[in-house]
């Protein structure tokens, strides 16, 4: 499917359930890899070992003392990702959310934007997900181009000194990171825990 066969418009009320399922599916595709990445870092392994050692004095089962900290840590990572990316965002100053629609009317992607925290930060992508059945067909790039156009228009209307777009990407989503780098974005830090990055932030001056 060529990008020219796609259109982007605001999400309709009756499309909310479909879009929400798409967001949840997108998070599920990466949450296990992010959890594995986070929990195999040396500081995390030390903390898990210390927690297991402490639980051995409380729990009668050695296996339970070993597995319980891992289970709780994985659950915390997954719940954090689902809360951040697996739900519909409230309407923001940039409008939306928007959906990518094929010529046949099938919704195949979703995008949401929000203003940056401080003046000059530009706009941020808060949701970007493509249905697994429509990936590698130009949907992500079409949504990204739409986001850039919205960010430029918003910056001009607000009198911002520059137009800028920031896209957060889970560390395990290598395909998205490669697409952004191919579109001229640069990785600039991110956030995580214990000194290790779980989400990278890519930015581009427009």
Curated annotation (Swiss-Prot):
It is found in: Membrane. One of its GO terms (molecular function) is N-acetyltransferase activity. One of its GO terms (cellular component) is membrane. The chain crosses the membrane at residues 57-77. This is Probable N-acetyltransferase 14. Gene3D superfamilies: 3.40.630.30. Belongs to the camello family. Pfam families: Acetyltransf_1. Disulfide bonds: none annotated. Its EC number is 2.3.1.-. The lineage of its organism: Eukaryota, Metazoa, Chordata, Craniata, Vertebrata. Probable acetyltransferase. May act as a transcription factor that regulates the expression of coproporphyrinogen oxidase by binding to a promoter regulatory element. One of its GO terms (biological process) is positive regulation of DNA-templated transcription. Its main location: membrane. Residues 6-206 form the N-acetyltransferase domain. Keywords: Activator, Acyltransferase, DNA-binding, Membrane, Transcription, Transcription regulation, Transferase, Transmembrane, Transmembrane helix. It comes from the Eukaryota. It comes from Homo sapiens (Human). It is a single-pass membrane protein.
């Amino acid at each position: 499917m060529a990008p020219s066969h796609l259109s982007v418009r605001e999400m309709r009320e009756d499309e909310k359930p479909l879009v929400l399922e798409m967001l949840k599916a997108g998070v599920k595709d990466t949450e296990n890899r992010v959890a594995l990445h986070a929990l195999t870092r040396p500081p995390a392994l030390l903390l898990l070992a210390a927690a297991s050692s402490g639980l051995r004095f409380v729990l009668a089962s050695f296996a339970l003392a070993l597995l319980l900290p891992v289970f709780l840590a994985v659950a915390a990572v997954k719940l954090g990702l689902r809360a951040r990316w697996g739900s519909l965002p409230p309407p923001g100053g940039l409008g939306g959310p928007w959906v990518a629609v094929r010529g046949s009317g099938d919704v195949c992607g979703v995008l949401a934007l929000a203003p940056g925290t401080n003046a000059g930060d530009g706009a941020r992508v808060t949701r970007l997900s493509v249905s697994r059945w429509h990936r590698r067909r130009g949907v992500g790039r079409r949504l990204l181009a739409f986001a850039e156009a919205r960010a430029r228009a918003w910056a001009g209307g607000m009198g911002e000194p520059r137009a800028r777009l920031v896209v957060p990407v889970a560390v395990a989503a290598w395909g998205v990171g490669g697409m952004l780098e191919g579109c001229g974005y640069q990785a600039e830090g991110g956030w995580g825990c214990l000194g290790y990055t779980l989400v990278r932030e890519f930015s581009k001056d427009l």
